[in-house]
Amino acid sequence: MKPKRVAWFLSIVLGAVATTAVAADATTVIKAHRMFDAVSGRLVEPGVVVVTGERIAAVGPGAAVPAGARVVDLGDATLLPGFIDAHVHIADQSSEDAYRDFYQDMLRFPAEASFYAEHYAQATLAAGFTTVRVLGSADWVDVSLRNAIRSGLAQGPRIVAAAHAIGSPGGHCDQSPFPPERVKPLTPVEGVCSGPESCREAVRDQMKWGADVIKICASGGVFSESDPLKVPQLTTAELEAIIGEAHRWGRKVAAHAHGDEAARLAVEAGIDSIEHGSFLSVETLKLMKQKGVYLVPTCMAGWWSTSHADSYPPPIARKARLIGAAHDEMMRNAIRIGVPIAFGTDSGVSPHGMNAKEFSLLTEVGMSPQAALIAATREAAKLLGVDAETGTLEAGKSADIVAVPGNVLEKISATEHPLFVMARGATVVGARP
C-alpha cells in the first residue's frame, strides 16, 4: 500500500476509534421514569444511571448528578441492562427465502463474510443487544469479529465466540447435503470428529484459535436435510471427551439438541446448556433443573421456521412443522418445573435485529415479563460467564444500558423499539454528545 493510502487509511480508522473513545470518556447521567432491577425483578422509580467512562458509577434514585455531567432524560421510559442473546449465528442471515440465503452464505469468501457479520452485529447492537454468544461460525469469522470489536476497529456487541460447532460426520454440524466430490471433507479443525480422541482434538483446535465456548451438535437439526431430529449424533464416550476437555480448559459447552435422548445423554455427561430442546421430556427437564443445566429455548427459530415452512424443501418443511408443534408444550413444562432459562434466538435463522421478538414469544408460552427480562440479562450473563461484567445495572459494571418506551412490564413488546442503547459507555442509539 502506498504511503499516502496508508496515511489516509490510518486517519479513518484512528478517527473512528477516537470518536468512540470521546463518547465513552465523559460522565453521562441517564434518567427515565423507571428502571428494571434484574437482581430483584422489580421496577425502581425513578430510574437513574450515572456513567463515567465505560463503567457504571452509580445507580438508583439517590445517585448524585456530578457537576458538568451530560444528562439524558428519556422521560416515560424504562431503563434496563443491555440485553444478552445467548444463541446467534453472526455470519448468517435469513429472509423469506432461507435456501437462497444459505447458498449465498456458502459462496462468500471468509473476508467477505466478515463484512456481512459486522453489518449483522451492528443491527443486533442497535436492537439493544450489547452481548451475544455466537454458537457456530465457519472460518473463524466470529473470533475475528470479536477481536475487531475489542480493538475498537468494528462496532458490535460483546461477543462470546464458539468458532466451529463440533459434531459427527453427516450430522447437523457437517455439510451433509453436499457430495464429497464437491466439498472437501471436514476435519476436527472444522469441528467434524468421530471417536473420543478425534472429538477431543476438535475441542483443542477450536480453543487454539480463540474459542471462548464450545458448541456441539448432539442431535439432528431442521436445516440439515438427511438427519432425523431426535437421533443422538454423539456417543456417550464422545460427549464425555468433548465436555471433559472443554471444562479442563475452563470453557463451557452448549449442546444443540432437539431430541430428548440426545439432550439427556448430554446432561448426564455434564453439559452446561441445552439449545432448542424441542422434544425434551419432563424427566429430562427435571434432571436439568437438578444439575443446574440451562435451557436456551430459541423460540424465534421455531416461530420463524414454522411460519416459513412452505418455502423449504419437503424434508426440512416437515421437520420445521414438527418442532413448532412440540416446542410450546416443552416450554410450558420447563417453566412449571423451574429449569434455568437463558434468552437466545438462533438469529441467523431469523433476521438479525429482530432478536427482541423472543420476549413476546417467551411470554406467550407462560413466562412472566419479569422472568423473560431476567433470562435476557442476569441469567444469560451467568451462563456466558460475563456476570461480573454485565447483566445487571450495578456500580462498577460495564455501562451496557438499553431504554424502551413506557412500562416494559405492561408491554413487553416495547423491547422491540429501543429509544436508547449504550454499549461499554458509548451511545449507539439515542442522543450522542
Could you tell me what each predicted segment is?
Residues 103, 248, 252, 312-315, ...:
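His/Asp/Glu-enriched, well-ordered alpha-helical/loop segment
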Residues 116-142, 155-165, 211-224, 252, ...:
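Divalent metal-dependent hydrolysis catalytic cores, especially in the metallo-beta-lactamase
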Residues 77-153, 169-172, 237, 261, ...:
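Metal-associated gating/positioning segment near the N- to mid-region
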Residues 147, 151-165, 230-255, 292, ...:
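Alpha-helix-loop-beta-strand connector modules within alpha/beta enzyme cores
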Residues 35, 40-80:
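Histidine-rich, glycine-flanked metal-binding segment
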Residues 94-97, 142, 172-173, 224-226, ...:
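Histidine/acidic-residue-rich catalytic or RNA/ligand-binding cores of hydrolases
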Residues 91-113, 169-188, 222-236, 291-325:
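Active-site gating loops and adjacent loop-to-helix segments of metal-dependent hydrolytic enzymes
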Residues 185-269:
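Metal-dependent enolase-superfamily TIM-barrel catalytic cores that perform enediolate-based chemistry
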